[in-house]
């Protein structure tokens, strides 16, 4: 039930096991939060636009016994993002470490070292929150209590912006390294610092785009 990415992934895995699958969707086309709409010849993503963990799509294709590139073309973005500020300055958010640090130095050389600290912290959060807890069941209160100490150690009660600000001083750079929650509909000022792990995801696997937009990716999975 539901044809978002979760429903599509479940359907693909179930079908690969030999079961006949019927996917139910309340809207006029698949996608869920990845819904797209058209207007005057243009197509707009209503939800996610980029791919930060392409390996999960490759895994689904492998399970289905097909090649992902036969259904959708996914290309890397370089830079990941180009960020424009009101004062006319531009920040190219890149995957290459040296180029990224050079961009940081243009805004505040002293923040290069602070960024490295944030980068290490992002990996620490990823290792615990994504690698160890991503498949943890939270359907019972007792299960949540078990991981409470881990969440406290990760300072999950802090916002992403506050966490970034503990490492980086320049106001513009604080925005650069804390805006990712916006991609999932969150507010960096109150979204849990757990989401700072997105930075490590991007640095490790890159930022990618499905040619034709998210709708093309959804149709490829269908």
Give each language-model segment a name.
Residues 48, 189, 208-212:
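Alpha-helix capping and helix-loop boundary segments enriched in small/acidic/polar residues
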Residues 1-124:
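N-terminal glycine-rich phosphate/pyrophosphate-binding loop and immediately adjacent elements
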Residues 190-198:
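Active-site-proximal loop/short-helix segments
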Residues 86-191:
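Rossmann-like flavin
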Residues 39-43, 182-185, 205-208:
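A short glycine/serine-rich beta->alpha loop
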Residues 56-59, 63, 103, 162-166, ...:
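Alpha-helical scaffold segments in soluble metabolic enzymes
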Residues 155, 197-222:
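Helical element adjacent to the flavin cofactor pocket in flavoenzyme catalytic cores
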């Amino acid at each position: 039930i539901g044809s978002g990415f979760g429903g599509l992934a479940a359907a693909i895995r179930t079908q690969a096991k030999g079961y006949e699958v019927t996917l139910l969707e309340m809207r006029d086309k698949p996608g869920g939060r990845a819904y797209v709409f058209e207007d005057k010849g243009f197509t707009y993503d209503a939800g996610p636009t980029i791919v930060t963990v392409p390996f999960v799509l490759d895994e689904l294709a492998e399970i289905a016994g097909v090649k992902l590139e036969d259904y959708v073309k996914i290309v890397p973005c370089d830079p990941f993002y180009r960020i424009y500020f009101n004062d006319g300055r531009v920040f190219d958010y890149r995957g290459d470490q040296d180029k990224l640090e050079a961009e940081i130095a243009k805004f505040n050389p002293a923040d290069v070292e602070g960024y490295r600290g944030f980068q290490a912290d992002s990996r620490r959060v990823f290792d615990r929150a994504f690698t160890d807890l991503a498949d943890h069941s939270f359907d019972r209160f007792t299960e949540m209590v078990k991981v409470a100490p881990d969440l406290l150690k990760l300072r999950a009660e802090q916002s992403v912006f506050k966490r970034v600000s503990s490492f980086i001083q320049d106001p513009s750079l604080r925005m650069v390294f804390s805006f990712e929650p916006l991609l999932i509909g969150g507010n960096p000022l109150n979204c849990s610092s757990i989401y700072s792990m997105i930075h490590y995801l991007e640095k490790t696997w890159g930022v990618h785009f499905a040619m034709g937009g998210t709708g093309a990716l959804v149709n490829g999975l269908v």
